[in-house]
Amino acid sequence: MKVSDRRKFEKANFDEFESALNNKNDLVHCPSITLFESIPTEVRSFYEDEKSGLIKVVKFRTGAMDRKRSFEKIVISVMVGKNVQKFLTFVEDEPDFQGGPIPSKYLIPKKINLMVYTLFQVHTLKFNRKDYDTLSLFYLNRGYYNELSFRVLERCHEIASARPNDSSTMRTFTDFVSGAPIVRSLQKSTIRKYGYNLAPYMFLLLHVDELSIFSAYQASLPGEKKVDTERLKRDLCPRKPIEIKYFSQICNDMMNKKDRLGDILHIILRACALNFGAGPRGGAGDEEDRSITNEEPIIPSVDEHGLKVCKLRSPNTPRRLRKTLDAVKALLVSSCACTARDLDIFDDTNGVAMWKWIKILYHEVAQETTLKDSYRITLVPSSDGISVCGKLFNREYVRGFYFACKAQFDNLWGELNNCFYMPTVVDIASLILRNREVLFREPKRGIDEYLENDSFLQMIPVKYREIVLPKLRRDTNKMTAALKNKVTVAIDELTVPLMWMVHFAVGYPYRYPELQLLAFAGPQRNVYVDDTTRRIQLYTDYNKNGSSEPRLKTLDGLTSDYVFYFVTVLRQMQICALGNSYDAFNHDPWMDVVGFEDPDQVTNRDISRIVLYSYMFLNTAKGCLVEYATFRQYMRELPKNAPQKLNFREMRQGLIALGRHCVGSRFETDLYESATSELMANHSVQTGRNIYGVDSFSLTSVSGTTATLLQERASERWIQWLGLESDYHCSFSSTRNAEDVVAGEAASSDHDQKISRVTRKRPREPKSTNDILVAGQKLFGSSFEFRDLHQLRLCHEIYMADTPSVAVQAPPGYGKTELFHLPLIALASKGDVKYVSFLFVPYTVLLANCMIRLSRCGCLNVAPVRNFIEEGCDGVTDLYVGIYDDLASTNFTDRIAAWENIVECTFRTNNVKLGYLIVDEFHNFETEVYRQSQFGGITNLDFDAFEKAIFLSGTAPEAVADAALQRIGLTGLAKKSMDINELKRSEDLSRGLSSYPTRMFNLIKEKSEVPLGHVHKIWKKVESQPEEALKLLLALFEIEPESKAIVVASTTNEVEELACSWRKYFRVVWIHGKLGAAEKVSRTKEFVTDGSMRVLIGTKLVTEGIDIKQLMMVIMLDNRLNIIELIQGVGRLRDGGLCYLLSRKNSWAARNRKGELPPIKEGCITEQVREFYGLESKKGKKGQHVGCCGSRTDLSADTVELIERMDRLAEKQATASMSIIALPSSFQESNSSDRCRKYCSSDEDSDTCIHGSANASTNATTNSSTNATTTASTNVRTSATTTASINVRTSAITTESTNSSTNATTTASTNVRTSATTTASINVRTSATTTESTNSNTSATTTESTDSNTSATTTESTDSNTSATTTASTNSSTNATTTASTNSSTNATTTESTNASAKEDANKDGNAEDNRFHPVTDINKESYKRKGSQMVLLERKKLKAQFPNTSENMNVLQFLGFRSDEIKHLFLYGIDVYFCPEGVFTQYGLCKGCQKMFELCVCWAGQKVSYRRMAWEALAVERMLRNDEEYKEYLEDIEPYHGDPVGYLKYFSVKRGEIYSQIQRNYAWYLAITRRRETISVLDSTRGKQGSQVFRMSGRQIKELYYKVWSNLRESKTEVLQYFLNWDEKKCREEWEAKDDTVFVEALEKVGVFQRLRSMTSAGLQGPQYVKLQFSRHHRQLRSRYELSLGMHLRDQLALGVTPSKVPHWTAFLSMLIGLFYNKTFRQKLEYLLEQISEVWLLPHWLDLANVEVLAADNTRVPLYMLMVAVHKELDSDDVPDGRFDIILLCRDSSREVGE
């Protein structure tokens, strides 16, 4: 160490020098600032020794593994002994407000870090633990203080601006000479931003007597006046107008330093350098400020004594600090001007000292913002790099960044590869870029005229283009909108990492605009392929003054391959996905639009097409080049191992320095090489010998060849130094033999034939019988065993034998699925060959069930066959599942025919083969006569391509099976029987599967057992089938509440009618053939998986193949069932159960249509089953009846017990004094609804249960009911006893009491429902004890007894089937409110519980989504669990007291005080996060329940309704009361609360009474119409009769006009929403062809309807997904009513004897109402004409209003929406004739569904 350095070292403030150097680590931490500023430093590498754990320095002998794990540090080398060397590294202590070192200038080059300490002296601002609690109030109520600051500044500026004209001015930093007015004119937006910046400092002023930083001021002196903070808080409370007189006086005194108030202002100004956290949206801070990494506000920390202190993690940036001072100056000037006589205190010469000091501070900060960073670069030879501003930048930094971007590119490519057969980068490079058959010889630089072929893409021969993109050019039109969007988004995302790869690969850096404008085609083209090296070369000429000559930069081979792949493959995919209608790009100055006669007439679509085919780096979503903000995000995270990240400017200077000092060694001797490197970095070369020894130099100074050579050599040096090609096996020498890389030679001399690829052949793994056993153990566990020997032998036959075609008939429930499931799993386990199999089922309803069963345990990869048809084989899926329509489709046939070619081109191997073709329930090919025309396409299928065909059925005797197979083009069954163990192939096998007879295995005949003997089959003739079916279902659910049932109806209309009428009794799912495929699958899956669903109603399609647990009953109402349909339906009862065949008396006989099987006959069902299967008849013999005709001998014990219980229940009902059916109809309906309440799931009940606070059991009594009421007492037992009476309802009501047991005892009576309702009490047990009576739905208390359906009082127990409330227990089925329990199926509100099947009742219309995506933060369960500060706990308690019902399912209307019946019609369903505009209550990284920092979260454990959710609903209430303009202004007014939902709720609650009154006043007419159903008559509207012909029409004319409008829309395929929005008749065929809601929404999104709606209407005031989500499940109740009206419409039409008219389906109907809602012109017209209605501003209210009925001119009733359409049509046309309208009535079969 030098003597001078030693002296500096001795002077350093390093007290623990000796003890630190005695440490065994080579690296020693040193906090000395002076030391590192005085002594030269170096960069050394260190590693952690695994054995000792010590930090060691990397030496020459350090091992390779330790070198890889090493890290670098800037250190000072110190010799502490003989050959003992230590290294000091600077460790900066985080400066806190209690003290701490000043940061080192060496480590913090930006002067702001010194300025906040030297100029603002923030280190002297000391905060203690009490201060932190006080500061917590600011963060807890930041929205309030933002609003307060804004209002105060706005009021002060308003008063100051109203002063008489004052000519006084002051000089400003930007206008120093003439000066500017002291009170400047400010816009409201500027005042609002200033207010956000002032909020923390306004808080400091209001708490000046509490914070320790003002301790010097707080010491009172005689005669001084203190700031009255309480008065300030009262005066500055946000109200209109704000009292600012006292505040103005305080500001004047602070400026004049009166009573030491200047000290307060002095401290507040110094505190401006502190970062109190970013403000809300629209606040201070620009993009540069927000981009600072690791920025944190003042946050709490714990010192060694356990005390909370505040630490400054990041000071304000110069730009943000300047804006804060701007706000402070504006506030001081405005506030002082309010009361001051003159403004001399702000004079530049004679002003007060405080103002001069503020000006000095401001000018220092302003000048700091204008200074550019100075880049101090030093050479670090040890690491082969440099140091830029103290940050190490070397080759490893560049390589780490580069390969991280490459990995990101590959990951995004992998996402595309999951959807497409993507060629790899190496494939494209080998096939085209390195292939010498492809020539890339062309002149460089762009041409003056735009040409289509001005791209190296056009130089690629067609034959290679076809091979490169075999999948992308096929079936493009069949790609869904979601898939297209996924493609475009993925390619947009991988564009950015590719830009970074190019940036590093060229070495000599680009400025960003130069990199941004890289183009592979067009007049600005600068991307070429060098024909010699096959690398990408870039010719760019960007310069700020436009005088730069073109620069040539060459990419390395690896980057060249990626760029070439991006242009040839990915960009073409992107163009196909965007489609011809893409028009996001506008004409910008950076693009050259040539080739058009009149550039002004060029459309956005033309411009977008040019850009896509020209420029590389695009953001197609925004319609622009990749923005710098997007590009630079990678710098914040990459490279991962770098301790300090460089920004883009530092990186640019670093790359230039690397090129100077590290890349080349000949610079000192070769001046031309050195100068070329500077020019390639766009640096000007200084003239003079002092730099390069030449007078002047430019690339024009040498010949063209020499200039090119110099630039190529510069790029070559960079490529070699960086080493990107070191592991890349595509060197320049190998490019000359690119033919070796291309797989295979041409199959013939024909030049146009496709290039064949080398295929890898592997030996086949042998099959073993053990494979089937292993597959079974994978699927069912280690204890797996086959059902019987037949099942084992069949599995081996399918898996092992060479028989190409097998047919199996087995009884329902036998396990036919496992016969092919196990062989498929065994095939998938083989590693030599990938088998792809296909399964087809007859109906869509089976699709979901099959996929669920086959994909369980993850043994098989299962996907819909639609994926294969549209996108081809993905190489991952083992089994594709589809329906018969898919099997018969031409596209599927074509895919199979081209299988070998597809596999060769895509997978480059022949080891991907077709496996099994499996057809389930194949008898339908013969028996489904009406569908046989649809099966014609199956005959074209190449069956020979499959390894084996398997046909399965439970109802296919030989005759049916043979005919079915022949109908699809196969030979049929083998004529003579074959032994099941015979594995030899016959001679006909050589002709292929289609020519080989199918081998039949008939397990029913082999076992000689009649199927369905385990089911009790009952044939009943009744007066009314629906009534009898309802009785049976109610009885079943009374006995087995968790069971399920299937009801088979004869027509689609009957299905819907039964569903509508039974929905009030139990949860129903209905299905028939007119539903869309997706809807069928969804409903089937819902019924199978949802345990709360009770009944599945459908036509015969629900009887085949569905496997349903807990199914106990099947009811047949169809009098046309044939024997196959009967067997399939009864076969759903896998484990036994009851099957009822209900027929009307004297109406069973039915004729069968031609070709169909005859219906079943009246008589013994078992004999008919035997006859069908060809079994021996036992008519008149013993054993004839098996499970039928009253025989129970073959039934299981559970089935027999179920029959007996059903019989007992029927007897009790028959002997009761008054049965339910004997009651009057209205009485019966009411009681039935109550009786079955616990199975009821209608939308009305769900709404009431949650939002109306209504109990499932009401307290009303009827007909001799007895009530026992107890008030303000403790009742151990409260009883109501009734003898010999009929109690429809017996209630025990208790108020403010604790009831241990509340009983209602009834003797010799019929209790339809017995309940106990309590208010503000705890009911441990509510029960009803009954003696010799019939209880339809009661709960009985029993002691030491066994009752399958009773309820006992249980504590800490488990009830299998109870109907009572238990505490700390598990209830399988409960119907009351439970606490701290787990309810498997409940219809009530639960607290701190888990509801496994209460989706409809626990969360309704938005709450479910809210709870799923935005759960309330549970403080006790979070990882940051801590003891909250007193301020936070106090705030939490206050909020809990202010909003006490958030533990329940509360809504804001309840909070306002509305009654439940009012809430039902004003209910705010559909209000979720998307209702709020972007930026309102949608901040991320904070608590999802209150939007506060996690340390300050005010949510409480058990809170069900978050404050954030209540804020959404409160915002919706405000929307109810405001029109569009007022609501937009309101959003601006509450902008301080956009990030503070809790503060907004407080603000909202202040106006609680006012809002309630306003809603009652504004919506009185709405409630009168919707709640009291007051009639609207068009004749009562004077303006309507005078101003519209529609109001003089009859109801029939209005209906006819409505049908005509829809007929025209349907014929022209017009987009509905757009038409009703602005009468724009835009075509959208996809909308009318959509089969389900999802496809419908995709069609609307594809044509840009939602985007236009947001841009044109008030829909932009909601979130981007709000309107789109209206088509989901928000309007289920309204949808059910509408679909029910469709059936009523059809019934009315048929009753009148007219042809039914087509009416819109639900999605089109909803589109119409949404379009009308946002049509401002129409709304104004309608509200003017129809005087009984007024404005509604929420979409749910509009939808409800549209469905009320109005009286037309002839006093006939029509829905209001029909009147709306008529008015809309009138506005579109000149006039509407008064006479009869011509309508188009489309005939329809009465049995079909009305609608689309």
UniProtKB/Swiss-Prot annotation:
E.C. designation(s): 5.6.2.-
Keyword field contains Chloroplast: no
Gene Ontology biological process terms, A to Z: telomere maintenance via recombination
Enzyme's top EC category: isomerase
Domain Helicase ATP-binding: 797-974
Ligand binding (ATP): 810-817
InterPro entries: DEAD/DEAH_box_helicase_dom, Helicase_ATP-bd, Helicase_C-like, P-loop_NTPase, Sir1_ORC-binding, Y'_ATP-dependent_helicase
Organism: Saccharomyces cerevisiae (strain ATCC 204508 / S288c) (Baker's yeast)
Protein name: Y' element ATP-dependent helicase protein 1 copy 1
PROSITE patterns according to UniProt: HELICASE_ATP_BIND_1 (PS51192), HELICASE_CTER (PS51194)
Induction: Induced in absence of telomerase TLC1.
Domain Helicase C-terminal: 1031-1180
Record's keyword annotation contains Lipid metabolism: no
Region (Disordered): 743-767, 1254-1278, 1294-1421
Keyword set, alphabetical order: ATP-binding, Helicase, Hydrolase, Isomerase, Nucleotide-binding, Repeat
